[in-house]
UniProtKB/Swiss-Prot annotation:
This is Aldehyde dehydrogenase 2, mitochondrial. Residues 72-92 are annotated as: Disordered. It comes from Saccharomyces cerevisiae. It is an enzyme of class 1 (oxidoreductase). Pathway: Alcohol metabolism; ethanol degradation; acetate from ethanol: step 2/2. NAD(+) binds at residues 274-279. SUPFAM superfamilies: ALDH-like. Gene3D superfamilies: Aldehyde Dehydrogenase, Chain A, domain 1, Aldehyde Dehydrogenase, Chain A, domain 2.
Amino acid sequence: MSKSKTKTDKRNQSSLSRIKLSALHYCMSDAEPSIAYLQDNSAFINNEWHNLVLEKIFPVYNPSTEEDITQVSEKSQHDSTEEDITQVSEKSQHDDDKAVVDISERGRLLNILADLIERDRDILAAIEHLDNGKPFDEAYLLDLASVLKELRYTAGWADKLHGTLRFAITIPTFQDLRFLRYTRHEPVGVCGEIIPWNIPLLMYIWKIGPALAAGNTVVLKPEELTPLTALTVATLIKEAGFPPGVVNVVSGYGPTAGAACLSHKDNDKLAFTGSTLVGKVVMKAAAKSNLKKVTLELGGKSPMIVFIDADLDWAVENAHFGVFFNQGQCCIAQSRITVHESIYDEIVERDLEKAKKQVLGNPFESDTRYGPQILKIEFDSIPRLINSAKAEGAKVLCGGGRDDSCVGYYIQPTVFADVTDEMRIAKEEIFGPVITISRFKSVDEAIKRVDNTKYGLAAYVFTKDKAIRISAALKAGTVWVNCVHVASYQIPFGGNKNSGMGRELGEYGLE
C-alpha cells in the first residue's frame, strides 16, 4: 500500500512539474494572453484592450529574483479613452439589450468563466507565481481551486436573488381597501473594486463574482505590483461572452487610478481589500463624493489561544501553516499566539523545531513551501519591527532577519517568545513570517487580552471543551476552532472594529 502511494505521489509530482514548465514557457511567449501581450494592453474597457498614456509606465517584477518581468501603463484621472470607464459600465448596467440583465444568463456566463479559468489553470498559476512570488504548487493547488469553488458557488445564486410578495394587506383607514405589497432586489449599479497584492487572483473573484451574479457592472483596479492575473482573466471575461462594459479592468497606482475609482460620482458601490489606513481614505472618499455603499476588508492582528486541553501537535501544526502560509502575507494570519502557562514551554519548544524545518527557496521548485515577501517596502519594514521586539525584550528563538542565502525578498521564519502585550510586535500587523508567543493564566485573562486590540478580523481557539464559550466572547468577524484558514464559500467573511465593515462570501456577500 505504501509503495503504491509513493509511486502515485511521484507521478503526480512529475505531472505537476511538466505543467509548470509548459505554463512558464507559454507565459513568456508573445501569445495572447501572455505577459508580453499584456505589456501593450494595460486596460480592459468595454471588452477592448487599451494602451494608456505611455509616459506613465511602471514595472512588474518577480520578488523571488528581484528582476523586472514586464511593465504596464497606468490609468489616471487625466487619461483620455473612447469613453469614460465608469460611464461605459453604467451604460451597460441600464442597457436592456445586454444579456447580463437576464438572471439565468448571469449564472451561465459565470459558469463558462469558471470553465475557462479551469482550462487555463496552469497559465494563471504561473503568472500568479511570477508577479506574486508564491510557490507555483500553492497557486495551482490552493488558490486556483478556491477561485473555481467560489465562482461556481456564486453562479448558482444568480437566479435565486428575488424579493418577497405579500397579498391582501388591509388598511382600515382607507375604507378597508386591499393592497398588494412586494419587495424587489435590484442591482446596486456600478461597483468600483480595488484588490490587494497578497492573493490577487482569489480576491479578484471574491469581488467580481457576487457583483456579476447580482446583475451589477464592475470597474476593477488591481494592485499596481500584481496586475497580471487580473488583466489575464479579463481576456477570459470576453471569451466567456460577457457583454461589453460589464467588467472593466484598469491598472495604475492608488493615488491616481484608485482615487479616480473612489471619487467618481457614477460609481454606486466601493469594495476594497487592503490596509486599515487606506480603508479610512476609501470611507472619506465615499462620503465626499456621493455616499457610495462601502465594503471594507482591512487589516488584522489575529490571536490564537491554545488551552491546556488542546491537541498540542495539531495546534503547533496549524499555527505554522496559518502564520507562514503566503509568507505571513495574509490578513487573518494568527501571528499573536497565547498559550496556557502550564504548556507554554512545551509549545515554544515544538514551535521552534517546526520553524527550523521551513524550506525557503525558488518558489517554482516542488519542495519549496516558503517564498519571498512580495513587496520591497515590506521586505525593508519587517526587519525593523523584528528589531523593535528585540529591543523591547522579546526572545528570538529562530530567524530574526533577512535570509541572505537566497536572491529575492526573503525573510527568515521567525519565532519570538516572552512577548508582552505592550510590545509593538504584539500590537501592529506584521504581514510577514513572524510568530509571537505569550502566556496566560486563566480563561478570562486570555479573552480580555486577545480582545485588547483595534483589530477584529479573525481569531483561533484550540480546545476540547471551551469552544462555544470562548468563540462567543471574542470580538472577531470569524472564529476558527481547532483549525485555521478553512474556507467555506457559503459562510460570510469580514471584520469588526478597524478590520473593516460589511461581509463578503455566502448569501450575505451578495446582499
